[in-house]
């Protein structure tokens, strides 16, 4: 007895592996994208700091480069360092 597959419709979903569900800077969901991007995914990745807080890449880069942030994490105020 042989089985012949006529059609196959695969469905997949993904989520970021972050403790929070929203970016602490722009307040947009991590499964979406930051205000600067049109589509979520590789062009708008999540970035973790040494303090384990996660943000959209574009959001944290703007935050760290702003004059008022003094390059500190917006959540815990530790000096911002990208997690290796």
Curated annotation (Swiss-Prot):
Alphabetic keyword roster: Cell cycle, Cell division, Cytoplasm, Metal-binding, Mitosis, Nucleus, Ubl conjugation pathway, Zinc, Zinc-finger
Pathway per the UniProt entry: Protein modification; protein ubiquitination
Listed InterPro entries: RING-box_E3_Ubiquitin_Ligase, RING-H2_APC11, Znf_RING, Znf_RING/FYVE/PHD
Compartments reported by the entry: Cytoplasm; Nucleus
Pfam family, one: zf-ANAPC11
Biological role: Component of the anaphase promoting complex/cyclosome (APC/C), a cell cycle-regulated E3 ubiquitin-protein ligase complex that controls progression through mitosis and the G1 phase of the cell cycle. The APC/C complex controls several key steps in the cell cycle by mediating ubiquitination and subsequent degradation of target proteins such as cyclins. The APC/C complex is required for the female gametophyte development and is involved in several aspect of development by controlling cell division and cell elongation. Involved in the control of endoreduplication.
Matching CDD domains: RING-H2_APC11
Positions of RING-type zinc fingers: 34-77
Cellular component GO terms held in the UniProt record: anaphase-promoting complex; cytoplasm; nucleus
Entry protein name: Anaphase-promoting complex subunit 11
Biological process terms in GO annotation: anaphase-promoting complex-dependent catabolic process; cell division; positive regulation of mitotic metaphase/anaphase transition; protein ubiquitination; ubiquitin-dependent protein catabolic process
GO molecular function: cullin family protein binding; ubiquitin protein ligase activity; zinc ion binding
Sequence similarity: Belongs to the RING-box family.
Oligomeric and partner information: Part of the APC/C complex composed of at least 10 subunits. Interacts with APC2.
Biological classification of the source: Eukaryota, Viridiplantae, Streptophyta, Embryophyta, Tracheophyta
Organism: Arabidopsis thaliana (Mouse-ear cress)
């Amino acid at each position: 007895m042989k089985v012949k597959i006529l059609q196959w419709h695969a469905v997949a979903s993904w989520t970021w592996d972050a403790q929070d569900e929203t970016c602490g800077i722009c307040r947009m969901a991590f499964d979406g994208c930051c205000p600067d991007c049109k589509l979520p995914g590789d062009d708008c990745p999540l970035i973790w700091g040494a303090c384990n807080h996660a943000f959209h890449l574009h959001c944290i880069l703007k935050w760290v480069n702003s004059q008022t942030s003094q390059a500190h994490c917006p959540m815990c105020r530790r000096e911002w360092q990208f997690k290796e």
